[in-house]
A protein has these predicted regions:
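Catalytic core of DAGKc-family lipid kinases
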Residues: 6-7, 15-16, 32-36, 74, ...
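Short, solvent-exposed amphipathic alpha-helical segments in soluble enzyme
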Residues: 20-23, 73-74, 150-151, 244-247, ...
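Short, conserved beta-strand edge motifs with alternating hydrophobic and charged residues
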Residues: 191-193, 227-231, 254-258
Length: 331
């Protein structure tokens, strides 16, 4: 098995030391320790395209994995079996296939080194938007919390950060920055239009059912927006199950609009975090393609990275699913 591994030095748990640990565990692997997107692009072009690996592992956060996937697409390289090494901050996607953090990643690679050729995998759909593929994309609190949390991390001394932990830092930024800002601002409004096959929704018991009036061209939702987006994985990171129904309907992406007021959402935060269903003002759809139309420019994030403000975005299910190594079943 030919293995290639990218380690992002800018990821929360990425370092040259981690790269050396990986080389000792997998001495035959091609390991690149990079500090910029340009370095990663050069590695893909010079190393991976001429000599395609059978297994490619992304060491970083969700943004690292998404950037690597899209660079492979841009270079016209067929995607090998992919794996996520959760060395980032939230690690929403990586948590679907294994434990995260430096120690957990190294333990997973130790098991991988003894696993042989036939690795267990999980198949995931991908969301496509603005020419990029991603496990999730959206706006509202998810994008704003992300920006606030990253700002908090950069300004928090490492000793305090270790005491607070990732979840503690996330909640600290949520309650000291994002929520106060939202309490005193008017929420945007959004119209969600179905552009694909007839939409499905979910009933109170969690079962997927046809949505009356959900045909192509129909408005699925119109009203206030606190959080909205599409995903093919359950978590946005740190255990936040923002899309608990992401795998409910194969061949569809899960679209969610949470419309509760800031005060109401704050009171329900533990329920939101765990993905409890049903909740008031919560709207779930399963579609192949849709458009979000906003009444103002809003922050938009793709796979954990903010990409700017948008008045309108289209999201669709990418036609080719991806196979991810399931580290929980690697023995």
């Amino acid at each position: 098995m030919s293995v290639a591994i990218l380690v992002n030095l800018k990821a929360r748990h990425g370092s040259a030391q981690v790269g050396e640990h990986i080389r000792r565990i997998l001495p035959d692997a091609r390991v690149a320790v990079t500090s910029s997107l340009d370095e990663a692009r050069a590695w893909v072009k010079d190393e991976l395209v001429p000599h395609r690996p059978s297994l490619l592992l992304s060491g970083g956060g969700d943004g690292t994995a998404v950037a690597l996937l899209n660079e492979l697409r841009d270079q016209g390289m067929p995607l090998p079996t992919f794996g996520l090494l959760g060395l980032g901050t939230g690690n929403g996607w990586a948590r679907a296939t294994g434990d995260v953090g430096k120690r957990a990643v190294l333990r997973g690679l130790e098991r991988l080194s003894n696993a042989g050729q036939d690795l267990p995998v999980r198949t995931f759909d991908l969301v496509e938007t603005e020419g990029r593929v991603t496990p999730f994309a959206g706006t509202g609190w998810d994008a704003q919390i992300l920006a606030d949390y990253k700002d908090t991390v950069t300004k928090t001394p490492r000793a305090l950060d270790r005491l607070g932990g990732s979840t503690g830092g996330y909640l600290r930024s949520l309650f000291t920055k994002t929520i106060p800002r939202q309490l005193f601002g008017e929420r945007p409004r959004v119209r969600v239009v179905n552009l694909g096959e007839d939409a499905l929704t979910v009933d109170a018991s969690g079962k997927a059912v046809p949505l009356p009036g959900g045909e192509r061209g129909r408005v699925l939702y119109e009203g206030p927006l606190s959080v909205g987006g599409a995903a093919s994985t359950e978590e946005l990171g740190l255990g936040f199950r923002a899309f608990r129904f992401a795998h409910l309907v194969p061949g569809r992406m899960a679209v969610r609009v949470y419309a509760a007021s800031t005060a109401g959402a704050t009171l329900r935060m533990p329920l939101l975090w765990r993905g409890v269903h049903p909740l008031a003002d919560d709207h779930h759809f399963f579609v192949t393609k849709c458009r979000f139309e906003f009444d103002r420019a809003v922050p938009f994030e793709i796979g954990g990275d903010l990409v700017g403000e948008r008045r309108e975005v289209e999201l669709s299910r990418h036609p080719v699913p991806i196979s991810l190594v399931d580290f929980r079943r690697v023995h």
